[in-house]
Amino acid sequence: MQTLNDIRSTFLSYFEKQGHSVVASSPLVPRNDPTLMFANSGMVQFKNLFTGVETRAYKRATTAQKCVRAGGKHNDLDNVGYTARHHTFFEMLGNFSFGDYFKEDAIPFAWDLVTRELGIDKSRLYVTIYHTDEEAAAIWKKVGVPEDRIIPIATNDNFWMMGPTGPCGPCTEIFYDHGDHIWGGPPGSPEEDGDRFVEIWNLVFMQYEQFEDGTRRDLAAQSIDTGMGIERVAALLQGTNDNYATDLMRSLIEASADASNTDPDGPCKTHHRVIADHLRSTSFLMADGVMPSNDGRGYVLRRIMRRAMRHAHLLGAKDPLMHQLVPALVQQMGAAYPELGQAQSMIIQTLLQEETRFKQTLERGLKLLDDELSALGEGDDLPGAAAFKLYDTYGFPLDLTQDALREKGRGVDTDGFDAAMAAQKAKARAAWSGTGEAADAAIWFDVADAQGTTDFLGYDTEVAEGQIVALVQGGTATQTAKAGETVQIALNQTPFYAESGGQVGDTGVIKTANGVANVTDCRKTADVFVHMAKVTEGALSVGEAAQLTVDPARRTAIRANHSATHLLHEALREALGDHVAQRGSLNAEDRLRFDFSHTQALSHEELARVEADVNAYIRQNAPVETRIMTPDAARELGAQALFGEKYGDEVRVVSMGRKEGSGKGLSGDTYSLELCGGTHVRQTGDIGAFVTLGDSASSAGVRRIEALTGAAALQHLRAQDQRLAAVAADLKAQLADVPERVRSLLEERRALSNEVAQLRRELAMSGGGGSAAPDVKDVAGTPFMAQVLSGVTGKDLPGLVDQMKEQMGSGVVLLIADADGKAAVAAGVTKDLTAKLSAVDIVKASVAALGGKGGGGRPDMAQGGAKDAANADAAIAAAETVLKG
């Protein structure tokens, strides 16, 4: 049997032999493409190559691309688990040509691989072509496909377009016939939606460029983009038409069944399929840097998680289930995707945390759903307001509610739901709409085309000469910028670092023979370094030579913070575990901030250890070295790459610190080794000192450490010393004695507080704390004592209630404390009466009479509160009503 891993290997090896570069899958989060939620096809990472914006060293490429379809236009979530072929996560195998070969090679490659390498029966294969693509039809005949199995299609299903304008072209598709025991007809027939004929490979011929007026012209460089769904091919090679019966999916389904002690098939079949599919998408999304949250990509991830968790609940799983299945996934897919194994610990922790949290509300939410349904007529849809309440109160995404109702044959009033959510949706749309930067950025692509990209000189110098190649004001190119005007400046080369990788952009001065500009920031678009500046003297013009000077003191501080971030990252991994991975950073001149994957707050001891380790490697004063190499070579040396980051053919590797036996670096003794394009100190000692300001939560599963280095760290320590000295002076103690003196004062305060509380209770018991000492009255045969007290707090009441119960022997006590107008209520029932009376009921009635809500406790002791104690008599009367039954 050819496993899914075998098929992937066969595909990539075949095209490598045909001169293709094997390119690693891009992350699921598309880089620099806010228009796309997740990568959903193999061509996503090559988009700029097809449009000509970018060039690479290769003209032919092959990939196995991770894809997710859940959310937005491409959304398969609702169907997953209920059909044989829908997935939220899938792999797309593809081969690509960027102006190299075209149809005459692409079609024979596809036929040869499918029939000879994979061994698929030719008699079961059909192909479709675009109805006017006679060239493709002729090539298919030439490779041996009978004419009656070449099906012309006139619809857009066989014509691909990148957008309203731009590259486009016809498609040809290969279909597999599963046999007449399955309903369905060939493509183009009325029965084409059946499952008998399944598309396994789509070849797109990027042949034309379409213009706004609808006309098309031949592209100068014609390209190939193909996509083969590996799950579908695995199914047919393993003798099934069900993707979930393939080796990989079956292993995950059986892991789910084992963990839940249920049958993998039968009534539980759908639940296991949902869990198996969603395990893949959630794990790979987290491995690529997406963490569960309440907006954007993180919200889509949380929706997928919660859908799987509901199905785990339906299996009867009492404990969190999803995290138990991660090792089975890593075993199956970790070799092909190493990032999955690297993130395994973090994925397990995050899934456990999310499922534990969600289980607390899931049962209550499902009960609310059942209550709402029981109030409806037979077959009625759930009102939108109720669906929104499930979303707003219990965190049920709409699709999870729809999924639950689907099993009951019900639907949801989605219009009502949308109306209830209008405000949130408007806010979300505003957040996603951006600020117009995309339109402003277009001009820099034109600059890159006309003038080339910017050469960065700043690794080696902070002063350089360059030539102004473009000036932009208000999104429009200009030839001159005058004193007092703000302007964006592009040069052929620059020492100014452009903001990226968490490091802020440089500031400084640009000076020409005719003018001076202060640079306030530097950013990068289309590999053009854009200097944000204000002209302070004279004027600047395109074509002028310029003297470029980076603010040296600011750059020095930024270097120190960025290098300290690398040491901090490694120290955290050693202190907390390999699951720690960078989730974000800020390397500014005055501070650094580092976000990392970890699910709980650091203890004081852990934070102290991390700080000490960083300072130890600073004192080591080891050289900071950089090398240029391929990403694969860097990873072989043990370099840390950022989750979700896509690297080019060459990367810059920064190493610092020495640690015997680390196994990293060329000599196997490097402490920190990371892929990084930022600027760094020359020796770790240049950082000076490192002081943490604390640890906080950044988002779910992500912690944040803020810290200072160098002079800022020393200033912080001096300020701390001054504060401590001031405390010592107030305490009239030596600095070394301050902790003991503070502990002694706290003990004295605690003893005095206890003494005051005891005196208040004694005063209250004697009748001096409010109304006179109460008499015991008979209410419906039950001894009842009630009193309103002042000078006591709610914390005092339980002790007073117990004392009064003991004095009474048998009966009920109600105490109301009036503290600055607010009411604290406590009630007690002696043990002999708790079978028929509950202190909880008495407190709730009294609190309600005072205008409050709630109250709780045990049958023999309960407490509550309200904002106003003025209606104490009504509260006592309400308690008597409870006693009377």
Swiss-Prot record:
Cofactor(s) required, per the database record: Zn(2+)
One GO molecular-function entry: tRNA binding
Cofactor, free-text remark: Binds 1 zinc ion per subunit.
GO cellular component: cytosol
NCBIfam families named among the record's database cross-references: alaS
Matches recorded under HAMAP family: Ala_tRNA_synth_B
Protein name as it appears in the record: Alanine--tRNA ligase
Organism: Roseobacter denitrificans (strain ATCC 33942 / OCh 114)
Lineage, uppermost ranks: Bacteria, Pseudomonadati, Pseudomonadota, Alphaproteobacteria, Rhodobacterales
